[in-house]
Amino acid sequence: MRDPLGIEQLAHDAGLSASRRYLVDWERAEAAIGTRLPADYKEYVHWFGPGGFDEYLIVCVPGVENSNTELAARLAHEHDGARSRKQINPGASPRVPLFPEPGGWLPWGFTTGGDGLYWVTSGGDPDRWTVAGRPGRGSDRAYFDGNFAEFLHAFLWDTVEMPFLPEAECDLPVRFEPDTGKWRTGGAGEPLDACGHFALE
């Protein structure tokens, strides 16, 4: 396994002075997805909790109230979209092979432009999963030779090479923008029963 770049360093680079201490029942979260999840992602969730980067890249988190940004709900949403596209055009190839297909793509994030970001679940060890993406429109696919933490480090410093991701227009490194994970009336997604929470001070 490659030496992962530290989540604590990622947090420091992104402007967090301390962990937000977001707590998840990982047994429940992984059961909802149907697989173990990478250790760097779990550490990220504890440090960062709900939120995104530069009002552009959103990382999905287990247990939040907003279905649009909840990890298992995001996977279900992608499957719903794939079924709808197949009904409209039965002969069309799927945009991406979705988990739980062998080696299927498991969504962990998206951009406000509709681009999707995924783990490629090849092999048995989640800590070896790499990252891939697809644009909001079209059938192109792009691959990143690294894991979740490495991708986010590259995103913060604007060195990700995916054709549909634009160059950063903000100062570097890109800053993290925290969120509560709550559903907003009239917003995207649907309200869920939240099971994740921030640790009490």
PLM regions: where:
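A surface-exposed partner-binding patch
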Residues: M1-G113, F164-P166, C170, A188-E201
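A short, sequence-level motif marking secondary-structure junctions
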Residues: S122-P126, F148-E150
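A short, charged helix-loop
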Residues: R128-A132
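Compact, glycine/acidic-enriched structural inserts
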Residues: G133-P163
